[in-house]
């Protein structure tokens, strides 16, 4: 029960952070062609926006706090992208040695282990949702 309450609290904080960054100007950014319909910008894109604003403006601290709040969501997005890329690479017939070289890993075994860790994190997050 405590985990569920903490998850709901984090989700509410992330929603508030997204709203704050959209109000701070992220809503007017051009849409990436791969974002269909009403899909919002990624947490990573919103963090990049906050960093850009902080480097170019005297930005309100709430923008920086909102970006910090989105760091766990951005990490989750990167995990999902990494898992999807590795699935895609294997589906396209790429070998583990080639995948490991592309990712800068020491061996095929390291790539397989990383795949297991990343997909495990993604699945754990889905199970918590």
Language-model segments: which ranges?
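Short, Lys/Arg-rich amphipathic alpha-helical interaction segments
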Residues: 92-129
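General nucleic-acid-binding
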Residues: 1-58
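Amphipathic alpha-helical interaction segments
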Residues: 42-45, 66-69, 98
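Charged, low-complexity, helix-prone segments enriched in Lys/Glu/Asp/Gln
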Residues: 17-25, 73-81, 118
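Short alpha-helical segment immediately N-terminal to, or the first helix within
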Residues: 88-89
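Short, Lys/Arg-enriched anionic-surface-contact patches
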Residues: 3-10, 59-81, 128
């Amino acid at each position: 029960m405590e985990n569920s309450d903490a998850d709901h609290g984090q989700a509410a904080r992330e929603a508030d952070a997204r709203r704050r960054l959209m109000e701070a100007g992220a809503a007017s950014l051009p849409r990436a062609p791969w974002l269909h319909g009403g899909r919002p910008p990624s947490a990573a894109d919103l963090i990049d926006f906050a960093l850009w604003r902080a480097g170019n403006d005297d930005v309100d601290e709430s923008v920086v706090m909102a970006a910090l709040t989105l760091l766990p969501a951005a990490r989750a997005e990167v995990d999902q992208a990494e898992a999807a890329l590795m699935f895609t690479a294997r589906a396209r017939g790429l070998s583990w040695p080639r995948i490991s070289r592309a990712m800068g890993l020491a061996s095929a075994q390291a790539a397989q282990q990383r795949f297991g860790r990343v997909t495990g994190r993604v699945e754990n997050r889905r199970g918590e949702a």
